Amino acid sequence: MKRFTHPFLLLCLVLVFSCSSDDGPGDDDNIPDPETGELYFPPVGSAEWETTSPNDLGWDTTAEQALYDLLEEKGTDGFIILKDGKIVVEWYFGDFTAGDNHSWNSAGKTLTAMTVGIAQEEGFLSIGDSSMDYLGEGWSMLTPEQEANISVRHHLTMTTGLDYTVDDPFCYDKECLLYKNEPGTYWYYHNAAYTILDQIVTSATGTDFKTYSYQKIRDRIGMQGNWITVGYNNLFFSNTRSMARFGLLCLNQGTWDDTEILSDKTYFTEMTTTSQNLNPSYGYLWWLNGKSQHKAPGSETTFEGELFPDAPDDLIAGLGAFDQKLYLVPSENLMIVRLGDDAGENQLGPSSFDNLLWERLNAFIGE
């Protein structure tokens, strides 16, 4: 496997793996660690953002053009690499500009996960509660007893047991929400079950989910962009730098410079580590690399091995349809954003483009 190497980091990895080798809930290999180096944060309300150069970082600039060419060939619109919070690379392709907005697609699930965590921190909900506590009885076609067994955590972990074989798996109308499995016994990437989290937050806080998310995250870290309803989906649209701001927030475990956005570190750890034993490569709506097995959207199959063999083991990611990418590499204080068109597979989350992209990134950044 290709990965970043540094003598001190190698020593840390040896110590970590000597103490833990399972993929169960609470596995902390992927937890972003703000202590690995000082992070820079761009000012809120300003376009100012400090930069650093590949040369200053000792990266292989002879591999930079190959990375650019791949991104251009695969329909990329915006691409940013942050190292220690500073911009190393910021590229826009075709007619797309720094001011243009783009859908995050399912990479926006990471925003929802943090919003739920903030609502819990503020005492509006508990993810261990039944969803019925916030949605009321009869939100689905299940019996009251079956509804009572589905918790908010099950929605965060894709384990509600709702029937994903319905005609429209995005539909969250009552008639579309049928029983298939006991909650917590089966993992499937079911978008309707995820989107219901918006209703849960709205009911729990008394504030519309979109507004609550803006107030608690977007506005406080200088993002722009909006949640837009498209069919049954609530999709977040923003410019590329706004996605990078959110990635930087997550790289620092929910703290923006000296401002706590999500101060509940227990929730943050649960969000960014294995959340259940059915798909060790999934946290609370975040994808996790370096695990022994994974499942993929649209498939019931369990695949042996990690998500992206060429990516760092501690990578965590927000992944959206048509290859929207938010990558965090905590061990290197590295954050990467890719927004654009489908790179060839039309996948809802992970795709072969991830590994191809990491081959070029490894050559540029260093293995």
Can you say where each PLM-predicted feature lies in the sequence?
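Bacterial N-terminal signal peptides that target proteins for export
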Residues: 1-8
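Bacterial N-terminal signal peptides
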Residues: 8-16
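Short, well-ordered beta-strand elements
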Residues: 332-341
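Active-site helix/loop module of the DD-peptidase/beta-lactamase fold
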Residues: 122-158, 207-239
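N-terminal leader/targeting segments and the immediately adjacent pre-domain N-terminus
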Residues: 19-97, 102, 120-125, 289, ...
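Catalytic-site signature segments of enzymes, centered on catalytic residues
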Residues: 98-99, 161-238
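Active-site SXXK
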Residues: 85, 102-128, 155, 196-201, ...
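Penicillin-binding protein/beta-lactamase superfamily catalytic region
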Residues: 222-330, 343-351
